């Protein structure tokens, strides 16, 4: 068919020149080369660049280290388009696990038509039952392999990021890894964490400038999410207003003492960021901390996140304000089930 898949973590592929391999494949009639685990191959971006420049072969490459790929991607500017595969949405989880296949909805659809959409969805599934499972086990496709070892695999994934990816791209001394793990545990057990950088530095024995650096690395690695206040604008040096685990599955993997309020907010931030972030925008500017309410989305909508007893007292008389409420199947007016924000992508 003219297509070939190779994985560069294979020892045989490690012994070859990727460019020469691609050249020979093209000479034998190859048209498309799929290259997996590309970050495991030394100077992979140079080889991809040379293939692009010298051959007519099309190349699709992928890797599981977003940090290592993004570091070398600058070599491929104007030659490649990089797509980031985010964690599964609640809707994708339902489809992957063969529970039910639903369409996704844009944010405006959910805000305006959530009652009719939820009424239709609840004819097919019990969303609250599956949502609780999703918060613990639904973010990554390897839930299909084995539920019992699911959280262990997440811990292994985080260890790989801390012990391999970060030192590789940032020249972090190995002695700092223990401090990084301490920092991550501190965040996991206190999210949504309202950061005091000085206190974090003291608790982890990391210097204040390094705390900022490490938080940025962890966010780029998709381990945490940070949120700034809109009032502070785009001040690069402004500390984050809140810190969350990137998704709730990471929280459950790191600690058994999960605050449900934290989990709700982390889910909301995760799904909004994943659904609305566009790589055509210079900054991730779709969601901020809000002065009234919890979150400001698209400079227009105010959201307060909570349990079913949450009321509008904190966002009373605020225009375009909504409650994202857990533990309800179907909402009413500006009161929207939290699980529905898992249908954005």
Locate predicted features.
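Conserved Walker B catalytic segment
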Residues: 39-60
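Interdomain hinge/linker elements that couple catalytic modules in large macromolecular machines
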Residues: 98-252
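A cross-kingdom feature that marks ATP-driven nucleic-acid transaction machinery
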Residues: 1, 8, 216, 222-345
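Structural recognition of the conserved hydrophobic beta-strand(s) that form the central parallel beta-sheet
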Residues: 34, 58-64, 84, 324
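Short regulatory helix/loop adjacent to the ATP-binding pocket of P-loop NTPases
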Residues: 67-82, 94-99
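Short glycine-rich substrate-engagement loop in P-loop NTPases that contacts/grips substrate
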Residues: 2-32
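Conserved P-loop NTPase "ATPase switch" module shared by AAA+ and STAND
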Residues: 26-44
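Sensor-1/coupling segment of RecA-like P-loop NTPase cores
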Residues: 53-73, 218
């Amino acid at each position: 068919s003219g297509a070939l898949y190779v994985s560069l973590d294979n020892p045989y592929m490690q012994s070859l020149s990727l460019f020469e391999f691609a050249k020979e494949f093209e000479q034998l009639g190859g048209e498309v080369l799929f290259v997996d685990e590309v970050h495991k191959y030394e100077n992979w971006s140079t080889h991809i660049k040379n293939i692009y420049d010298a051959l007519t072969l099309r190349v699709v490459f992928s890797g599981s280290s977003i940090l290592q790929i993004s570091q070398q991607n600058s070599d491929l500017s104007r030659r490649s388009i990089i797509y980031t595969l985010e964690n599964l949405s609640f809707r994708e989880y339902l489809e992957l696990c063969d529970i039910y296949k639903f369409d996704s909805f844009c944010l405006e659809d959910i805000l305006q038509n959530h009652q009719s959409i939820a009424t239709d969805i609840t004819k097919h599934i019990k969303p609250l039952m599956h949502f609780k499972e999703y918060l613990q086990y639904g973010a990554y496709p390897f839930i299909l392999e084995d539920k019992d070892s699911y959280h262990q695999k997440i811990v292994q994934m985080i260890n790989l990021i801390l012990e391999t990816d970060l030192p590789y791209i940032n020249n972090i001394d190995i002695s700092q890894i223990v401090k990084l793990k301490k920092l991550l545990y501190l965040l996991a057990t206190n999210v949504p964490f309202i950061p005091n950088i000085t206190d974090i530095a003291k608790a982890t024995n990391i210097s204040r400038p390094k705390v900022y650096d490490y938080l940025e690395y962890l966010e780029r690695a998709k381990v945490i999410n940070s949120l700034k206040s809109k009032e502070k604008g785009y001040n690069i040096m402004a500390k984050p207003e809140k810190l969350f685990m990137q998704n709730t599955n990471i929280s459950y993997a790191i600690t058994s003492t999960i605050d449900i309020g934290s989990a709700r907010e982390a889910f909301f931030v995760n799904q909004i960021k994943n659904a609305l972030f566009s790589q055509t925008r210079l900054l991730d500017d779709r969601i901020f901390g809000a002065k009234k309410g919890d979150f400001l989305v698209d400079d227009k909508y105010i959201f307060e996140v909570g349990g079913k007893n949450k009321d509008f007292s904190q966002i009373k008389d605020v225009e375009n304000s909504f409650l994202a409420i857990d533990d309800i199947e179907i909402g009413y007016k500006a009161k929207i089930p939290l699980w529905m924000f898992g249908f954005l992508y």
